[in-house]
Amino acid sequence: MKPRRWKTLARRDVVRDRWLRLRADRCELQPGVVLDPFYVMEEPDWVHTVALNATREILLVRQYRYPADVFTWELPGGWINAGEEPLVAAQRELREETGATASRWSFVAALHPNPARQTNRVHCFLAEEASVTSALELDATEAIECGFFSVSAVHGLIRDGSFSQATHVGLFHLALPRLGA
C-alpha cells in the first residue's frame, strides 16, 4: 500500500512548558482507521557543530545525560533560540560550551532527528580552524568537559560506546568527507 498523509482529527496538549510541547493527536491514517492517541513532541530546532582545530582534531564535549544515566562525548550544540539563524546558534553554542571560535564555517546538513515522534530538525555545521579563545559560558544546568580528538580516536569512542548519541554519530560521518580524513 502506498503511504498517505495522515489527517489530524483532534489535538490536545499533554505537556506544554518552556522545554517542550507534548501533544496527543487523534489521527485518521486511512478511511476508517483512527489512531488515538498519537503522541508528538515539539521542541525547537537544534544545532550541532563538527569543529576542527588547525591540526584537524575534532572538538567534543562530555556531559552527563540523566535520562540514559550515561556520560557521553558529543558534538557541541544546543537549541536554536526563537528568531535565531541556525549558523548564529551554532557559533553561539560552540563559544558557550567550549570557549572556542572558528574562522571558517560551512553547512553540512539539516535532518529530522526522529520524524516518527518529533517535529524539529537538527542543523549541522563544520567549523574549521577552531581554537579556544575564552572561558566557557555554561548555564546553571550544564557541567561540561571539552577535548580535541583525532578522527581515529572519535571512531574509537563510537566503538566503545562513549560517543553514542545517534544523531551526533550520523552528523560526524556526514562531515567525514570534508575532514580530509
Model-derived features with residue positions:
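Extended interaction-bearing regions that mediate binding to partners or small molecules
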Residues: 1-15
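Unchanged
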Residues: 36, 46-48, 53, 78-170
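Residue-level detector of high-confidence beta-strand sites
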Residues: 11, 61-63, 110
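Short, amphipathic C-terminal "tail helix"
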Residues: 169-181
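A glycine-rich, hydrophobic loop/mini-helix early in the fold
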Residues: 43-70, 74
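Short beta-strand micro-motifs in enzyme catalytic cores
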Residues: 21-25, 71, 121-123, 145
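Acidic, metal-coordinating catalytic segment for phosphate/diphosphate chemistry
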Residues: 11-48, 54
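Residue-level structural signal for beta-strand termini and adjacent loop
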Residues: 39-40, 64, 113
